[in-house]
Each structure stands twice: as structure tokens, then as C-alpha cells.
């Protein structure tokens, strides 16, 4: 390792994580982002945008399974799914495993992200870009949800952190647009950072989403390269019952979907909605 250069993440001040770089596969500044993909002995291929790790081959399955199977199995009858972001294709891969879904629309602001991920992160999409149910739209997510005539049963916001291009996906304009194109009984989910270190993000999202949805909460998972504690995912719907389904119902839907997962299971689904007290306290503070 001493002979290999080190890549340091710049997300937090005063502490962080580093990766040894075995081989740089791609590094280029696009119109929107500074993007790098490199090999690391511990985590396989690593993709980072603007100095922040976005995904690694070794642990991406945790994030993508939880972002997809939790809302899709909670809904129980989703036919039309919208993914905002997700250019690496792994979110699409997991959504496409649900054969009952009829259409999958993905909106990505940067066509370059999609093209190089197909080349350099092929295990992430695993051929899902060729699914006949899939449509790719190159557009700004806020613009799309406020202009589209399509409606969706589940919306998944695979957004980056709320800096740079990702900032708009944490705004009231985006959340209002998502509510606008979400079918009755639909579910919206979004990554919302590691709540111990990024608590303000969770509080801000909760406050804004509550203007548009009757039931707003979070669920969580522990993802190694998103260090600092549990990662939270925002959850918003007008049907509170969908967040409190019994493990028996989730188990039956999981069995019917014929899924085999590496992290997600019905027990994890139910337990994921249990949140630490410090987050409850922050969300309820005046």
C-alpha cells in the first residue's frame, strides 16, 4: 500500500477516510462534476464525484437493495417507477428485478455519467440498461418532476449530497414536483446522508416534505463507505399504513417477488424504521 497513492475524501472537515489507489480507470471533469473511478484492493472499483465517494463495488448492494425493495414491497403493486439520478445503473438493476413493474424511467442530469458507468462499472448495472421497460431521460430532476405528464407509483431519488448539482434535489420545488407526479398511495424515498454527521439534512428534508405528504419519516442501513453511523433514507407518503406493514405481509410479498438479496430481507425491512433517539429528538425540536 505504501507504494500506491492515496485518495482522500473531502466530505467532512477534520476527519475522513482514504483509499489506496491501485489503478485510475477514469478521471475527468464533466460539465457538471469532477468524476474519478479507481481500483482499490479492499473495495474494488470506487466512484467519487467532487471528492466524495458515491459507490464501491464491494458494498453498493446494501444501499441499492434498501433504496428499492423497501418502497417497492411496501407499496405492493407498483407498476410505474421513477428513478432520479442513479446513473451508475445499480438502482435500475434492483428495480428491474421486480417483474411486475411495467415501466422504469430514469432521469439523469449528466449523460456522461451513464456512458462511463456502463464502461467502467458494468457490475453495477448488470445489463439492466437493456431492459425493454426502461427509459432514460437526460434532464434536470426538478424540471422533470414539475413538467412531466407521467405519473408514478414509487419515486426513488438517488441524489448526491446537497452540494453542487445535487442541492436542487433537496428543495421544496423538487419535493412538490414529486408529489405532483406521484399516484395516490405512492411512495417517495431519497438518500439523506449519515444522520449523526449530517443531521441538518434530515431535519431540513423532514420539514420540507411534511408540507406535501401526510406521513414523513426515515429508515436506515449501515453502509461501510458511507462512514459515521447509519445512513438515513427519507420516506414520504400519504398512506401511513405502508410504513407499518406486518413482517408477515412483507414476507409474503418478498416470496412472491422471488427475490434473492445479500442485505435486504423482511426482518431488515421492518427493523429499518427504528431510528435512534437523537434523530427523533432533532426531528421533533421546535
UniProtKB/Swiss-Prot annotation:
<dbReference type="InterPro" id="IPR035246">
    <property type="entry name" value="Spermidine_synt_N"/>
</dbReference>
<keyword id="KW-0745">Spermidine biosynthesis</keyword>
<feature type="binding site">
    <location>
        <position position="64"/>
    </location>
    <ligand>
        <name>spermidine</name>
    </ligand>
</feature>
<dbReference type="GO" id="GO:0008295">
    <property type="term" value="P:spermidine biosynthetic process"/>
</dbReference>
<dbReference type="InterPro" id="IPR029063">
    <property type="entry name" value="SAM-dependent_MTases_sf"/>
</dbReference>
<dbReference type="InterPro" id="IPR030373">
    <property type="entry name" value="PABS_CS"/>
</dbReference>
<keyword id="KW-0963">Cytoplasm</keyword>
<feature type="active site" description="Proton acceptor">
    <location>
        <position position="158"/>
    </location>
</feature>
<comment type="pathway">
    <text>Amine and polyamine biosynthesis; spermidine biosynthesis; spermidine from putrescine: step 1/1.</text>
</comment>
<keyword id="KW-0808">Transferase</keyword>
<dbReference type="GO" id="GO:0004766">
    <property type="term" value="F:spermidine synthase activity"/>
</dbReference>
<dbReference type="InterPro" id="IPR037163">
    <property type="entry name" value="Spermidine_synt_N_sf"/>
</dbReference>
<dbReference type="GO" id="GO:0005829">
    <property type="term" value="C:cytosol"/>
</dbReference>
<keyword id="KW-0620">Polyamine biosynthesis</keyword>
<dbReference type="InterPro" id="IPR030374">
    <property type="entry name" value="PABS"/>
</dbReference>
<feature type="binding site">
    <location>
        <position position="108"/>
    </location>
    <ligand>
        <name>S-methyl-5'-thioadenosine</name>
    </ligand>
</feature>
<feature type="binding site">
    <location>
        <position position="88"/>
    </location>
    <ligand>
        <name>spermidine</name>
    </ligand>
</feature>
<dbReference type="Pfam" id="PF01564">
    <property type="entry name" value="Spermine_synth"/>
</dbReference>
<feature type="binding site">
    <location>
        <position position="33"/>
    </location>
    <ligand>
        <name>S-methyl-5'-thioadenosine</name>
    </ligand>
</feature>
<comment type="subunit">
    <text>Homodimer or homotetramer.</text>
</comment>
<comment type="similarity">
    <text>Belongs to the spermidine/spermine synthase family.</text>
</comment>
<dbReference type="Pfam" id="PF17284">
    <property type="entry name" value="Spermine_synt_N"/>
</dbReference>
<feature type="domain" description="PABS">
    <location>
        <begin position="5"/>
        <end position="238"/>
    </location>
</feature>
<dbReference type="InterPro" id="IPR001045">
    <property type="entry name" value="Spermi_synthase"/>
</dbReference>
<comment type="function">
    <text>Catalyzes the irreversible transfer of a propylamine group from the amino donor S-adenosylmethioninamine (decarboxy-AdoMet) to putrescine (1,4-diaminobutane) to yield spermidine.</text>
</comment>
<protein>
    <recommendedName>
        <fullName>Polyamine aminopropyltransferase</fullName>
        <ecNumber>2.5.1.16</ecNumber>
    </recommendedName>
</protein>
<feature type="binding site">
    <location>
        <position position="165"/>
    </location>
    <ligand>
        <name>S-methyl-5'-thioadenosine</name>
    </ligand>
</feature>
<feature type="binding site">
    <location>
        <begin position="158"/>
        <end position="161"/>
    </location>
    <ligand>
        <name>spermidine</name>
    </ligand>
</feature>
<feature type="binding site">
    <location>
        <begin position="140"/>
        <end position="141"/>
    </location>
    <ligand>
        <name>S-methyl-5'-thioadenosine</name>
    </ligand>
</feature>
Amino acid at each position: 500500500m505504501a507504494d500506491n497513492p492515496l485518495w482522500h475524501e473531502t466530505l467532512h472537515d477534520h476527519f475522513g477516510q482514504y483509499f489506496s489507489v491501485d489503478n485510475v480507470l477514469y478521471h475527468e471533469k464533466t460539465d457538471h462534476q469532477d468524476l474519478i473511478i479507481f481500483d482499490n484492493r479492499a473495495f474494488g472499483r470506487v466512484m467519487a464525484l467532487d471528492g466524495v465517494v458515491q459507490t464501491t463495488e464491494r458494498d453498493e448492494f446494501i444501499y441499492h437493495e434498501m433504496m428499492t425493495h423497501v418502497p417497492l414491497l411496501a407499496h405492493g403493486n407498483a407498476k410505474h417507477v421513477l428513478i432520479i439520478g442513479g446513473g451508475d445503473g445499480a438502482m435500475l438493476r434492483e428495480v428491474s428485478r421486480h417483474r411486475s413493474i411495467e415501466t422504469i424511467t430514469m432521469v439523469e442530469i449528466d449523460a456522461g455519467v451513464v456512458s462511463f458507468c456502463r464502461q467502467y462499472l458494468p457490475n453495477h448495472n448488470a445489463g439492466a440498461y437493456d431492459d425493454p421497460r426502461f427509459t432514460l431521460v437526460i434532464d434536470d430532476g426538478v424540471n422533470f418532476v414539475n413538467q412531466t405528464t407521467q405519473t408514478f407509483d414509487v419515486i426513488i431519488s438517488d441524489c448526491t449530497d446537497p452540494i453542487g448539482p445535487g442541492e436542487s434535489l433537496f428543495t421544496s420545488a423538487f419535493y412538490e414536483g414529486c408529489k405532483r407526479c406521484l399516484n395516490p398511495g405512492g411512495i417517495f424515498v431519497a438518500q439523506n446522508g449519515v444522520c449523526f454527521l449530517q443531521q441538518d439534512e434530515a431535519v431540513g428534508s423532514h420539514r420540507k416534505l411534511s408540507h406535501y405528504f401526510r406521513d414523513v419519516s426515515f429508515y436506515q442501513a449501515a453502509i461501510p463507505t458511507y462512514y459515521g453511523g447509519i445512513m438515513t433514507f427519507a420516506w414520504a407518503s400519504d398512506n401511513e399504513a405502508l410504513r407499518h406493514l406486518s413482517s408477515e405481509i412483507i414476507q409474503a410479498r418478498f416470496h412472491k417477488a422471488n427475490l434473492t438479496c445479500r442485505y435486504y430481507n423482511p426482518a431488515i425491512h421492518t427493523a429499518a424504521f427504528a431510528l435512534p433517539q437523537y434523530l427523533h429528538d432533532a426531528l421533533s425540536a421546535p
